[in-house]
Amino acid sequence: MSDWDETEHPRDTRGRFRDKSGGWVEQVADRLVDPGYVRGQPIDLDPDVIERLARVRARDMAEFVELGSDRVGGDSRLAEIAQMQGWDAPGETGTPQQLQDLLEQGGVRLWRGVTPPVSSVDWTGGLFPGKGSPQWPTEAIAQTVRDHKTGPVRYGYGIYGNGMYTSVNADSASAYAMDGEREAAIRMVLRPGARVAQWEDREEWYDEYERRLGEMGLPEDTRRNLTDYGLAAMLLGYDAIHVPPGWDDGTDWDDAQYVVLNRTAVLFEAEPGDDWED
């Protein structure tokens, strides 16, 4: 993104932005549908965008070689696109009633189980069963949950596209939550009106994206750097990818999944609940 130029965003005498027809304030206001929700828009793959994504990808690969896959902080290409879209803002949290209100308006309840990074493990013994097990400090669990909501955006890797994987099934989330603890799970609601790409319709949106990539005549390594379902969906302005039931989710349930790409498109619970009830 280009540097901020204050002269392009004039303010009134009290420091508030003056609205100009067709200007920056109006453009941003059009994208703020609900408080805290920034609606995405298609991003052109111009040379500057391609160079930015190549740069962060090279950094990810260097970290992978140096630190190993368990220490790499996710796909930085998607974090870069989130910044371009304005999706890198802290997530919004709400009360149980506020989440329920969104559900009644057509939102989708989602769950995500988390485990703190390996670097926070306190090893009390050996690596094998019966010789001790890793112990995650309580604060590490709480910090991981907070980071998902309001920390720097981080996107994991997955077969249906990189992003933040969630499930409509609390049982699926418990399988990924540290020791199945409720404190290591996050309940959230995908806002009504969120723009969702359908996994089973990917021939329509992803194949079209790849076709356009092919027409650009990019070098093979550059083109390969731009091929991921989650990355493509973000560039197209989608908030999430919906994967219907029946596709492998890594648990025994294989329920519907949503790969969340726009953190502002969900409302998180402010504090972990004390149960797994829907």
Predicted regions located by residue number:
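IQ-motif-like calmodulin-binding regions
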Residues: 2-14, 18, 25
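Small disulfide-bonded, cysteine-rich extracellular recognition modules and tandem repeats
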Residues: 18-20, 114
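Short hydrophobic alpha-helical segments that form membrane-spanning helices or hydrophobic packing faces
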Residues: 21-23, 176-177
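Charge-dense, low-complexity polyampholytic segments
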Residues: 23-31
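Active-site and NAD+-binding cores of ADP-ribose-processing enzymes
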Residues: 31-171, 177-278
